């Protein structure tokens, strides 16, 4: 879909009042379910312990390449000048000092630092998977390669960007008055653009889930805006309240840095929750929604889709499943797929599509009931798409389960104890 078409689609949906209200409620419930503030606190705690190993890895990678080594100081200065509150600037000196002392570490100490960094990165991935309702994770080796690639290439790309920008701003064009104005504007906008690009790529790469650009971009915009507001708010507060320096003295930067890291994670996770909500939200009229308690009907229809896809020798992507079965929500689809993956019935291929991993002749309804823990509904409800082929066979299978159960449930509770006697 073209960017202009996507924007027009968003505007059209925003004018649909019922859809907008429904999405607002859905988004609020997702915010509450994700427990973002608690997750941000946990990530802030682990991030503090990962700052030193992160600095060691980044500066170590840059020092390994002479062409990048001389840009490490400029990179550090740029990061702390544009992304960290001035009151926490003292942390830069400590991190550089710790990085310079990395050569004195023993092998066990270095391994401990790397492990703490990997734990932090793993915590970030787990939090993002939780936000996107992904139950499965990448294989350990794949995760390690992704983390290492992001750290090493990220450091080199950042240093290379500084080098290129320095060469560009040294051109005669930027020596004129108009050129200086343009350079000043670019320098002001660069931190915001960097935040936006980094967060967008984070939303695309980190979750073990296919995140589309049209969902990642709005979340990244929200996160970048919140980050700028937080940066301005902390600066305004610290500028009018100086008592913290008298209270904490030379370590005054520590609580400020902790607060800044926490608020950064709050902004990023709020943006991630918006992105996942946009991908998961499916607006349907009431008559086309799957009634609560009839998820087993949706499960049988879902397996029917996989049965037909397997006969054609192909898999099904999440978007295609939701298009074929619009009654399913993204959250329900992810829950069902993860449950079926646990019993080896589904698996993902290298393209992220779901495939049947076992023949359905080897699976009983009892297996489905035990792995999903879905209820067998008793009351009559209007079910969407009950008259198509999948609807008829799924409803017939469900009736075979629930109609005898309905008769059994008509039994009086007192009948259970009729023959038990008067005493326990």
From Swiss-Prot:
Please give the InterPro entries that the UniProt record associates with this protein.
Answer: UPF0761_bac (IPR023679), Virul_fac_BrkB (IPR017039)
Keyword Cell inner membrane (UniProt)? yes
Q: Per the UniProt record, which residue ranges are transmembrane?
A: 48-68, 101-121, 144-164, 181-201, 216-236, 251-271
Topologically, how does it sit relative to the membrane? Answer: Multi-pass membrane protein
Any one of the GO CC terms: plasma membrane
Q: Which UniProt keywords apply?
A: Cell inner membrane, Cell membrane, Membrane, Transmembrane, Transmembrane helix
Q: Which Pfam families match?
A: Virul_fac_BrkB
Question: Belongs to which family?
Answer: Belongs to the UPF0761 family.
Its localization reads: Cell inner membrane
Protein known as: UPF0761 membrane protein Smal_0716
Question: What NCBIfam families does the record tag this protein with?
Answer: PRK04214.1, yihY_not_rbn
Q: What is the lineage of its organism?
A: Bacteria, Pseudomonadati, Pseudomonadota, Gammaproteobacteria, Lysobacterales
Superkingdom, according to UniProt? Bacteria
């Amino acid at each position: 879909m073209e960017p202009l078409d996507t924007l027009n689609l968003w505007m059209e949906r925003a004018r649909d009042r019922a859809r907008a209200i429904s999405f607002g409620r859905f988004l609020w419930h997702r915010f509450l379910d994700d427990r973002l503030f608690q997750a941000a606190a946990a990530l802030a705690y682990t991030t503090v312990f990962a700052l030193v190993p992160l600095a060691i890895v980044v500066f170590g990678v840059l020092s390994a390449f002479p062409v990048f080594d001389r840009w490490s100081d400029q990179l550090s200065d740029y990061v702390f000048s544009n992304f960290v509150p001035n009151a926490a600037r003292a942390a830069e000196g400590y991190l550089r000092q710790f990085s310079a002392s990395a050569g004195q570490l023993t092998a066990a100490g270095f391994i401990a630092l790397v492990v703490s960094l990997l734990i932090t990165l793993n915590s970030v991935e787990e939090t993002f998977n939780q936000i996107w309702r992904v139950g499965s994770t990448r294989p350990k080796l794949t995760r390690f390669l992704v983390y290492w690639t992001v750290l090493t290439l990220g450091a080199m790309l950042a240093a290379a960007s500084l080098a290129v920008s320095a060469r560009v701003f040294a051109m005669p064009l930027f020596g004129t008055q108009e050129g200086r104005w343009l350079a000043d504007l670019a320098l002001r906008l660069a931190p915001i653009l960097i935040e936006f690009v980094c967060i967008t790529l984070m939303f695309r790469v980190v979750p073990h889930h296919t995140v589309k650009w049209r969902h990642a971009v709005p979340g990244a915009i929200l996160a970048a805006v919140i980050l700028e507001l937080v940066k301005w708010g902390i600066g305004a507060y610290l500028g009018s309240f100086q008592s913290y320096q008298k209270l904490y003295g030379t370590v005054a930067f520590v609580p400020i840095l902790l607060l800044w890291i926490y608020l950064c994670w709050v902004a990023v996770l709020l943006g991630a929750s918006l992105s996942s909500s946009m991908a998961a939200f499916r607006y349907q009229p009431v008559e086309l929604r799957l009634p609560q308690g009839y998820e087993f009907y949706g499960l049988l229809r879902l397996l029917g889709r996989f049965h037909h896809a397997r006969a054609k020798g192909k898999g099904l992507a999440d978007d295609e499943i939701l298009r074929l079965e619009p009654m399913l929500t993204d959250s329900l689809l992810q829950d069902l797929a993860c449950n079926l993956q646990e019993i080896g019935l589904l698996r993902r291929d290298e393209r992220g599509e779901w495939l049947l991993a076992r023949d359905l002749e080897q699976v009983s309804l009892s297996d489905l009931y035990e792995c999903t823990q879905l209820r067998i509904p008793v009351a009559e409800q209007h079910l969407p798409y009950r008259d198509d082929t999948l609807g008829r066979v799924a409803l017939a299978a469900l009736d075979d389960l629930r109609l005898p159960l309905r008769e059994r449930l008509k039994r009086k509770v007192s009948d259970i104890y009729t023959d038990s006697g008067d005493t326990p």
